[in-house]
Amino acid sequence: MYKYLLFDIDGTILDFKAAENLAIKALFKKYKLIECTDEMVNDYAKINDKYWQALERGEMTKPEILVGRFVEFFKSINVDTSIASDFNKDYQLELGEYVVFEDYAIELLTMLKGKLNEDGSRKYRLLAVTNGTKIAQEKKIKTSGLDKIFDGVYISEDIGVEKPNVAFFDTLFMEEGITDKSEVVIIGDSLTSDILGGINAGIDTIWYNPHHKENTNGLAITKTIFSLRELDNRRCFE
């Protein structure tokens, strides 16, 4: 039976794409840039994904990707790249202003937090695990009220390494006093950070795949779900 439920934040509990769209459009207005369309945000998102994957592979540092993604994006739309650093700083703060939950996320977490053992003790310890920046994640977790639901929040910037690096999970295991990995499962939408990270760490994995993507990496996933409602099952975490 699982006792420790590790939840990714962006794309699993929170609808990151929706918040990303709102934050970027708001900043384009603040900086008095050209009109930002959905198509432009989608193009940025592809660039952003590419940079984060480079970070996960250890090919770039976090400061490099945070600014570099906007430099490349601005070049593609003929916007002055000299604002990239300041734009990124404002973007981290702006992201925390927009909280959009994935379908059934808050209901699921609330239900799991209320699950009790026969002796009245809590059945699960809910832990957030994220590669997002510290400033953005702390703000959105507080704004969303998730700080009152999660028992612990683990941010890669605090730990010093990103998922899927096994050191991220080793730090969590040590701080939580976890010795039996069979009691731990990670739930996340990213194959390259959440699922690969869980596999690297030797724990079970649940791939949240609402867009029905293919497992192109051929990873040995413990369970795949297409809706968080599938986790609302009394046997799901047993």
What annotation goes with each model-predicted range?
Residues 1-5, 110, 127, 132-238:
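Asp-based, Mg2+/Mn2+-dependent phosphohydrolase catalytic module
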Residues 28, 74, 116, 141, ...:
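Conserved hydrophobic residues forming the short capping helix/wall of the S-adenosyl-L-methionine
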